[in-house]
């Protein structure tokens, strides 16, 4: 083959170029003549244009950058196609014997091969539907994965089994939460018992079982609606049914016991028992019953009786059943409780169990004494037997056999005290008795006219069934009897017996209401104020002396104050007679007291409306009584007993 140096420079190149351009510009003929041999050899001689190499280099740089970012997969095909085109062009330019051109196909049959790189950079040949696609590039290794250090996306993982298990558990729980069950109970009373006060019980049950419990409305069927998980609903159902059954048992027990909420057993039906009725005012029925029946239960336990409380629409009468002495004791305790809480008895008539009197017995000194008052039994009811009359060995609040409280009262026989421990017996140390000369005076039957106080109702004797240490007279007890009162004075203006000598000889034995005060000397006493039934409206008067201790010449001191109760039923201590000794200090004015029934024995002008404490002499007007208590050494003009306070009597 001739070398390229022997070829003509201008003609061959120009002819080749012209032929190429002309072939590209003219329409192809039906049978184009093949180019001359010289033209085929001289065709690759000229340098290819630089545009395809520059475009391929720029494209290769861009594809390398995209490959570094992991996005060059789509550009591999273009890069390979461009590289192949460039290599083919370079081979055609360097080698003298170029590969045979592709058989002509279509209008580009006469196109020289040098124009192919310029026409098809990258994927441009694909835009021509008539052009044949380039051959597939050889496989290249994938670029390094720059995202290998990151965690895989959750979507790339398979379906998790743990999540499926959790969803199944949640689905089953949702099904159990929606469970609802109805729990019926027998009655609306059961509903109230299960719900509790202000819903406290049903709230606790909701919290305990972790359920929602809908309570039935008043007037609807007694059915609870429980919502929650299956096991929680079952637990709540068991609790509700158990509470309903428990309440049914309690109600059945109450119905067997007579329907009494305050009784644990039915009415006794033992031989020898009796039933009495104790009538009280309407306003004190709740006071006697007490909060939740506590007071009436305590009285039943102390007296061993069975007490039926009156209904709301019935008469205020308590039915007391038991042994005769226990029945009387229960009646006395009911009356004593009313007296302690209201400050006075309520008089409902001569035949009533409540009595009005003018006696102030310093109720707050007794504290929680079981009984304070005892009434002489009616003629139709036998008096209680004397078991331990006036003994001081019964503990406060402890159930015990009732004592005889009627010793020495009018119309009843005097009962001697068999107990040597009684501080108030006629033979014990420190004892005293009505109308007796000394501690060993005989005990006999009181005369019908003895101690006539002018009352239209039975005489009230003080119940002294409290321990000796708890009595109100404990500070005044001494080994030897002391003279206290002489003669029978008046109560509320009613005249008494004119002489005390007959009283001394009568020998009647009755316990005192007022203490025998010791002689002043070496003894310091502090007496609390007497009980007042209601707030004192006259307590702020200007003539009321201030409270304070008053000293006596012998060294004894007493607390002086005035106590003026405003209740009509509150009164002064009843004056009581005593068998004073012959040397008793009796003032001359005491003999004229019966003649001046309603006039003050001091000033003889004012009306008698005050009494002194503790002697209880109701002989003075209010001004004189206050003046007596305001002295440096206050003492009663009638008995020379130190006076601690003056009380106003509303008669």
Swiss-Prot record:
Gene Ontology terms describing biological process: mRNA destabilization; mRNA localization resulting in post-transcriptional regulation of gene expression
Molecular functions per Gene Ontology: mRNA 3'-UTR AU-rich region binding; RNA binding; zinc ion binding
Region (Disordered) location: 1-159, 375-394, 401-443, 495-531
Compositional bias ranges of the Gly residues kind: 8-23
One Pfam family matching this protein: zf-C3HC4_3
Intracellular or extracellular location(s): Cytoplasm; Nucleus
Superkingdom of origin organism: Eukaryota
UniProt modified residues of type Phosphoserine: 514
Zinc finger (RING-type): 600-640
Post-translational modification: Phosphorylated.
Residue positions, PTM Phosphothreonine: 510
Keyword Cell division applies: no
Domain notes: Binds RNA through its KH domains.
Function as written in the Swiss-Prot or TrEMBL entry: RNA binding protein, may be involved in post-transcriptional regulatory mechanisms.
Protein name from the UniProt record: RNA-binding protein MEX3D
Organism: Homo sapiens (Human)
């Amino acid at each position: 083959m001739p070398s390229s140096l022997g070829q003509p420079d201008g003609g061959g190149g120009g002819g080749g170029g012209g032929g190429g351009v002309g072939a590209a510009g003219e329409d192809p003929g039906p049978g184009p003549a093949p180019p001359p041999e010289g033209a085929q050899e001289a065709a690759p001689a000229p340098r290819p244009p630089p545009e395809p190499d520059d475009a391929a280099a720029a494209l290769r740089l861009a594809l390398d950058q995209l490959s570094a970012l992991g996005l060059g997969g789509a550009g591999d095909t273009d890069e390979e196609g461009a590289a192949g085109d460039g290599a083919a062009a370079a081979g055609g330019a360097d080698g003298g014997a170029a590969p045979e051109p592709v058989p002509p196909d279509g209008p580009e049959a006469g196109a020289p091969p040098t124009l192919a790189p310029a026409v098809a950079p990258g994927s441009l040949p694909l835009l021509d539907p008539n052009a044949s696609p380039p051959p597939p590039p050889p496989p290249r290794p994938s670029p390094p994965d720059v995202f290998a250090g990151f965690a895989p996306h959750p979507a790339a993982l398979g379906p998790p089994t743990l999540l499926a298990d959790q969803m199944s558990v949640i689905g089953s729980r949702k099904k159990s939460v929606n469970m609802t069950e109805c729990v019926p109970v027998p009655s609306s009373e059961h509903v109230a018992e299960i719900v509790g006060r202000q819903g406290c019980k049903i709230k606790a049950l909701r919290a305990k079982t972790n359920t929602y419990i809908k309570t039935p409305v008043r007037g609807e069927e007694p059915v609870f609606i429980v919502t929650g998980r299956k096991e929680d609903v079952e637990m709540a159902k068991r609790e509700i049914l158990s509470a309903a059954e428990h309440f049914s048992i309690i109600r059945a027990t109450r119905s067997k016991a007579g329907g009494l909420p305050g009784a644990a057993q039915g009415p006794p039906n033992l031989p020898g028992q009796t039933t009495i009725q104790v009538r009280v005012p309407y306003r004190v029925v709740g006071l006697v019953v007490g909060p939740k029946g506590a007071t009436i239960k305590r009285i039943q336990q102390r007296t061993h009786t069975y007490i039926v409380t009156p209904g709301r629409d019935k008469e205020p009468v308590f039915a007391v059943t038991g042994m005769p002495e226990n029945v009387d004791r229960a009646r006395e305790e009911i009356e004593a409780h009313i007296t302690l809480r209201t400050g006075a008895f309520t008089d409902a008539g001569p035949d009533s169990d409540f009595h009005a009197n003018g006696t102030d017995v310093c109720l707050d000194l007794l504290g929680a004494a079981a009984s304070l008052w005892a009434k002489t039994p009616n003629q139709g009811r036998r008096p209680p037997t004397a078991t331990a009359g006036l003994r001081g060995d019964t503990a406060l609040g402890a159930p015990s056999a009732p004592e005889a409280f009627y010793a020495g009262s009018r119309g009843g026989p005097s009962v001697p005290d068999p107990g040597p421990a009684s501080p108030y017996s006629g033979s014990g140390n420190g004892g005293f008795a009505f109308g007796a000369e000394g501690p060993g005076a005989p005990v006999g039957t009181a005369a019908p006219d003895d101690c006539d106080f002018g009352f239209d109702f039975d005489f009230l004797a003080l119940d002294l069934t409290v321990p000796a240490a708890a009595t109100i007279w404990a500070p005044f007890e001494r080994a030897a009897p002391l003279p206290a009162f002489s003669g029978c004075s008046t109560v509320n203006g009613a005249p008494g017996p004119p002489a005390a000598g007959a009283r001394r000889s009568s020998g009647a034995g009755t316990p005192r209401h007022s203490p025998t005060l010791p002689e002043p000397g070496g003894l310091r006493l502090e007496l609390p104020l007497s009980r007042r039934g209601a707030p004192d409206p006259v307590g702020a008067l200007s003539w009321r002396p201030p409270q304070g201790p008053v000293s006596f010449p012998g060294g004894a001191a007493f607390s002086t104050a005035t106590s003026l109760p405003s209740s009509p039923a509150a009164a002064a201590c009843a004056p009581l007679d005593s068998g004073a000794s012959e040397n008793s200090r009796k003032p001359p004015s005491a003999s004229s007291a019966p003649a001046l029934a309603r006039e003050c024995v001091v000033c003889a002008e004012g009306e008698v409306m005050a009494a002194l404490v503790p002697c209880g002499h109701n002989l003075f007007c209010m001004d004189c009584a206050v003046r007596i208590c305001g002295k440096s050494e206050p003492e009663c003009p009638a008995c020379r007993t130190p006076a601690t306070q003056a009380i106003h009597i509303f008669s």
